[in-house]
Amino acid sequence: MTEQKKKLEKLSGVKGMNDILPQEAGLWEFFETTVKSMLRSYGYQNIRTPIIEHTQLFKRGIGEVTDIVEKEMYSFTDALNGENLTMRPENTAAVVRAAIEHNMLYDGPKRLWYIGPMFRHERPQRGRYRQFHQVGVEALGFAGPDADAEIIMMCQRLWDDLGLMGIKLELNSLGLAHERAAHRVELIAYLEKHMDVLDEEAKRRLYTNPLRVLDTKNPAMQEVAQNAPKLIDFLGEESRAHFEGLQRILKANNIPFTINQRLVRGLDYYNLTVFEWVTDKLGAQGTVAAGGRYDPLIEQLGGKPTAACGWAMGIERILELLKEEQLVPEDEGCDVYVVHQGEAAREQAFIIAERLRDTGLDVILHCSADGQTASFKSQMKRADASGAAFAVVLGEDEIANGTVGVKPLRDTNADGGKNEQHNVPAEDLTEFLINAMVATAEDGDD
């Protein structure tokens, strides 16, 4: 082996698990700020659960015969104690587990929200990743259609806050367990008569989760699915009253919707109301938010019988939609970039930068990239590229005179060039910058 160092193989990220780089992070922060403001306005409280849970939580909560549990979960055995663990594929079951474990419902209903990464072993494509991010709400302890309506209206408010248009609401009712059981018998009998049309996926689901057969995207099966027995025909008085009550509230609040009798969800815990918010601008991955009522789940996971409803939305899909509709906010950059030349100026630059940060300004202090002092020209190029509103300039002359140079970087004069540098007494710098920023903001509003 030669003395020459062997070139190390360049490592890359896991397929379907994406880095969020600085140029993208601003859009994420914009969305997160907007959605958190909306959630606060409805009185929802943040809950944060672990990324890893016991596998049994999802098997019992989501359903053993669902696609998620059968094919999509990242599960492993803990080498230390042999526990079967899973990286969460969704978060409703985990939030319910936490509510039960910590006795959160002892003093009444709770409005909770979460945000974070989820994991599913899928074929990566646009809008569908192996690590993806969701924000969601869980309204625990609310039984009537008013809670269903409120969580739906929260989504509409978020679309309005983000400026998104054309996201459509689809509704359905899955009724109660005994109603679904009666429909299931009729549905299986009907589908058995059309075995020659069913694809392999439908045949696999026929006796385990026949409702999902109706959600097929296979063109050859559309007629069979369309003519299948309708669950709505099996709904009793209680289920119908709940669904009609929801519709009345939505109509009274001018929330348009379409009833989609083939709308089901890929998780077993839903009953009564289910809904999706869909768009035609993202291709096959058109669902941006989905949810419904899951009254049986809390008891199913070991708690007392408690009504509940909620939704989750895919953040990556919403960000794709913001980009598609050109609603990405501009990065405003920082307020001040401090450049300096000479040892005394460097020491003073640190002091000034911290003083400006104390007032709430965002400040970048030039630091050497190669251990050498860069020229003023080079530093000013960095200042321009940073997007800062002003450059604060410190050199030997400024230190000797007790002044600081301030150069506007965004403003232009009548000739289209940058405005000239001002020399300001060091003790007046903060006041000067704040006044200059206020004036710039007022000019921008004109």
Swiss-Prot record:
Subunit structure: Homodimer.
Subcellular location field: Cytoplasm
Domain of life: Bacteria
Keyword Aminoacyl-tRNA synthetase: yes
Record family assignment: Belongs to the class-II aminoacyl-tRNA synthetase family.
Species: Paraburkholderia xenovorans (strain LB400)
Signal peptide annotation: none
Catalytic activity: tRNA(His) + L-histidine + ATP = L-histidyl-tRNA(His) + AMP + diphosphate + H(+)
Gene Ontology terms for molecular function: ATP binding; histidine-tRNA ligase activity
Protein name: Histidine--tRNA ligase
Claim: Aminoacyl-tRNA synthetase is one of the keywords in the record: yes
Gene3D superfamilies: Anticodon-binding domain (3.40.50.800), Bira Bifunctional Protein, Domain 2 (3.30.930.10)
GO terms (BP aspect): histidyl-tRNA aminoacylation
